[in-house]
Amino acid sequence: MLLQMAGRGKMVPCVCLGLLGVLCWVWVSFASFPDEQLSLGAMDAVERAAFQPQSALSEMEFASIGSYRGPGNLDHRSNKELPILLWWSAGLFPHFPGDTERIDCARSSCLATSNRKVQLYKRTASIIFYGTDFRAYEAPLPRLRHQTWALFHEESPMNNYLLSHGPGIRLFNYTATFRRESDYPLTLQWLPSLEYLLTPVPVPLEEKNRLRREGLAPVLYMQSHCDVPSDRDRYVQELMKYIQVDSYGKCLNNKPLAGNLEDTSTATGEEQTFMSFVARYKFHLALENGLCPDYMTEKLWRPLHQGCVPVYRGSSVVADWMPNERSAIIIDEFPSPQALAEYLLHLDENDDEYRKYLEFKSPKRITNARLLEALERREWGVNDMSKPNYLNGFECYVCDQENARLAAERAHRKAPKTNKPPEWKMANNSHMGCPLPSPGYGQVHHLPADDGWLQTWPQDYWQSLDQAEGLESLIRHNESDPSLLWKHIQNMAVRRARGKN
């Protein structure tokens, strides 16, 4: 971790004359705000130190802003009166063309923008971050008291382990993650619909048995993303000792993929020829790249869609979302790869037992009430033009939450004895927290010191905690330069070594 500090630039001290000029400029700018807009007495030190431009958007820009018509509402305020939501990851901004748009949500309206010029503007109520892109050493500092932070992270926990630690996740006030406990859950993001589970008709078992007699393995492994936190290849390699596995991807490859087929195992699309090819297998090894409650991807849902049985490792609570009580084979329910192989061979030789895993394909055989209710109630859609996507959905969630918070703050200021101030929301570990990566097979203390997985993922996990605590320290000390992160991490390490908290 300390090696990462090498080569970092240091802040250039301001000369006295320049500092005096800046202070005068800030004083004049503050003085230009009406009392009700700035309210210095109600602001903490971090906001007093920040220059608050009246607007980064000109009058002409306000007038020409487009409008995303969501559910619609009775909010008739002008664009200049609306709170602003700043998308910090511009590449995820869910509107085009342009970088600013009015959004009309279920209960209220906001301006959404990816224009970072508005970061310090008083009306910028919330900053929305994409978890994969969030870096402690690039955070928008100083953090202003009047702004909330919102996190959108639907991808693997491996993309940013900072979010799996308490000091990291509690930086955010609103969350949209794969965890059901998040404010705007994306748990079933890879399941388009109930119909997706029911179709197509599986390859007949008689055909699968014929292919087995001709040499097709009972188990398919299709992975081209190797060396991941879940260490799945280590487990599959051990499993291969006890049962035949056809592996077509780059990981543990033992069979070439036909030239007319494209490996779409890591893609979001579903090429039909490839899907038909893999549907011939009885079992699909479906091991996620990261292990975390409710983290379930296409690796789980595609085999179910195709009428194959997923042999699954990923979410520890995956059974909560399965179509019925017997839809998938959970790897962690078996004491060893050998025991799992024996069970798969048993199913391979017993058609009646195997068919029980595909009963959900029949009408009215999907009995999981939680799954059915979640699909029915979610407001966003997957490849469904009749519903908003989850980016627009979360954006509107934040917009409505912020308008409610701001209204409650105004009511409290007008009648503090009658109206309580709004409660400050803060995310916790249940919104994202994922466990320390562990070996796919065996115990960590049995691994050689030069093991590539050991040298990578456990270290990444704990270094991410250092960065989360470092950013928390930057915010606590009202720092405005995020590159000071490494200095704060070093100072905390020194304090710990001296036995100080």
Swiss-Prot record:
Any one annotated GO CC term: endoplasmic reticulum membrane
Look up keyword Hydrolase and say if it applies: no
Q: Which residues are glycosylated?
A: N173, N428, N478
Drop me one GO molecular function for this one: alpha-(1->3)-fucosyltransferase activity
InterPro entries assigned: Alpha-1_3-FUT_met, Glyco_tran_10_C, Glyco_tran_10_N, Glyco_trans_10, GT10-like_C_sf
Segments spanning the bilayer are 11-31
Give the record's keywords alphabetically: Disulfide bond, Endoplasmic reticulum, Glycoprotein, Glycosyltransferase, Membrane, Signal-anchor, Transferase, Transmembrane, Transmembrane helix
Keyword Transmembrane attributed: yes
Q: Name one GO biological process term.
A: positive regulation of protein secretion
Query: Cellular location of this protein?
Result: Endoplasmic reticulum membrane
Topological domains annotated Lumenal: 32-501
Catalytic activity of the protein? L-threonyl-[protein] + GDP-beta-L-fucose = 3-O-(alpha-L-fucosyl)-L-threonyl-[protein] + GDP + H(+); L-seryl-[protein] + GDP-beta-L-fucose = 3-O-(alpha-L-fucosyl)-L-seryl-[protein] + GDP + H(+)
Give the pathway annotation: Protein modification; protein glycosylation
The protein's superkingdom reads: Eukaryota
Q: List the membrane topology term(s).
A: Single-pass type II membrane protein
* Side of membrane Cytoplasmic, spans: 1-10
Q: What cystine linkages occur within this chain?
A: C396-C399
Write the Enzyme Commission number(s) for this entry.
2.4.1.221
- Give the similarity note: Belongs to the glycosyltransferase 10 family.
Chain's role: Protein O-fucosyltransferase that specifically catalyzes O-fucosylation of serine or threonine residues in EMI domains of target proteins. Attaches fucose through an O-glycosidic linkage. O-fucosylation of EMI domain-containing proteins may be required for facilitating protein folding and secretion.
Q: What is this protein called?
A: GDP-fucose protein O-fucosyltransferase 4
